[in-house]
Amino acid sequence: MTRTNSDFLTNSDPAIAGLINQELQRQRDHLELIASENFTSAAVLAAQGSVLTNKYAEGLPGKRYYGGCEFIDKIEQIAIDRAKQLFGADHANVQPHSGAQANFAVFLTLLKPGDKIMGMDLSHGGHLTHGSPVNVSGKWFQVCHYGVSQQTEQLDYDQIRELALRERPKLLICGYSAYPRIIDFEKFRSIADEVGAYLLADIAHIAGLVATGLHPNPLPYCDVVTTTTHKTLRGPRGGLILTRDAELGKKLDKSVFPGTQGGPLEHVIAGKAVAFGEALKPEFQGYSAQVIDNARTLANQLQTRGLKLVSDGTDNHLMLVDLRSVNMTGKRADQLVSEVNITANKNTVPFDPQSPFVTSGLRLGSPAMTTRGMGEAEFTEIGNIIADRLLNPDSDTVAQDCKRRVAALCDRFPLYPHLEIPVPVLA
């Protein structure tokens, strides 16, 4: 009988095996609406759980500091080539362990401590690594932040230009963690050129949409592009750096290794290669289009039920529910949907009077449940479930009904039906 990795884990460490199995069951039984999460394919899982985890491979393909990298080199080169093809880049580094690591490598390449960076305020939808005072990017560099218009809750490029002209940053950052609208990278390029700044696009959230042409591609306009490889790209958790400037690419490579990292995680890079290959297939185009259709369907249904959305809708995979109109905090809303097996996250909204630990918003996304096969009909039902729960927060009857409807949806769209980690019954 052939033994699987799961068999070995179960026999070696039933406690960990049992907890992994419980997490698998949680993922199966919940509606996953966290905008930054997705479900990788079984092939990606297999690559990450392979013997590649054993191999040290400091350096780049063909230029390693360790022996025995002949097969590692081929795998990493495939990942590089596929990433370049997917995004239309001339250079790709697939080694960053995360999106944050990718951004740090860019900072090391383009900036010196004390230089000024300009990115979106975290409370308006930016990211920690774009100059938040609690992050190293906000400690090593001077920072100025732009936000969205108070009237439209969308980017105001005239305001951004005025701030850039006043502050003269060395690096201008676009790309966000909670912005539901299209980004005009060409306008950002014009602003960067006017003030003599480098332009970085962090497309961690929208990479899958960019790869399929459903969101404008920043590469023709930006000096450097960074992204994560999960979220809408549906790969393993990791980072990626892209550029069309080959000479700049060499400097970025040195900033990844030895600048900010040691040995790359080759089992994760193999998972990235598999995911990039999947994203190059025609089926991924249909998936990405469905992600947007499902997000718009969910947004429309929430609005139909009387809930307010930041910027009045979405162009991509995510939306922000502004709960101030129903006198509720994001923390309370997160708790309410969690109780009926919906996973989301509280989130600040623009000009939020609440603290980041409380917030006035709830962020929702469509990628994960689209991966499970759900379409507009299911996302209409999801919108109704969320509205029923939030608009009837004190009703146990409504809560039980919502939980039942969540279970019915999950049962119709099974997750990883082939996966099971057998856990022995301990005496």
From Swiss-Prot:
Q: GO biological process annotations for this chain's record?
A: glycine biosynthetic process from serine; tetrahydrofolate interconversion
Question: What compartments host this protein?
Answer: Cytoplasm
Which residues are annotated as site, described as Plays an important role in substrate specificity?
A: H230
Its UniProt entry gives the catalysed reaction(s) as: (6R)-5,10-methylene-5,6,7,8-tetrahydrofolate + glycine + H2O = (6S)-5,6,7,8-tetrahydrofolate + L-serine
**What does the record give as its pathway?**
One-carbon metabolism; tetrahydrofolate interconversion; Amino-acid biosynthesis; glycine biosynthesis; glycine from L-serine: step 1/1
Residues where N6-(pyridoxal phosphate)lysine occurs?
A: K231
* Record-level GO cellular component terms: cytosol
> What top-level branch of life does the organism fall under?
Bacteria
Q: Which cofactor does it need?
A: pyridoxal 5'-phosphate
| Keyword Amino-acid biosynthesis listed | yes
Binding locations of (6S)-5,6,7,8-tetrahydrofolate? L122, G126, H127, L128, S355, P356, F357
Q: Give the chief site where it resides.
A: cytoplasm
Task: Please provide the record's keywords in A-Z order.
Answer: Amino-acid biosynthesis, Cytoplasm, One-carbon metabolism, Pyridoxal phosphate, Transferase
GO MF: glycine hydroxymethyltransferase activity; pyridoxal phosphate binding
Instruction: Report the CDD domains cross-referenced here.
Output: SHMT (cd00378)
Q: How does it assemble?
A: Homodimer.
Per the similarity annotation, which family is this?
Answer: Belongs to the SHMT family.
State the name under which the record lists this protein: Serine hydroxymethyltransferase
The species this protein was found in: Nostoc sp. (strain PCC 7120 / SAG 25.82 / UTEX 2576)
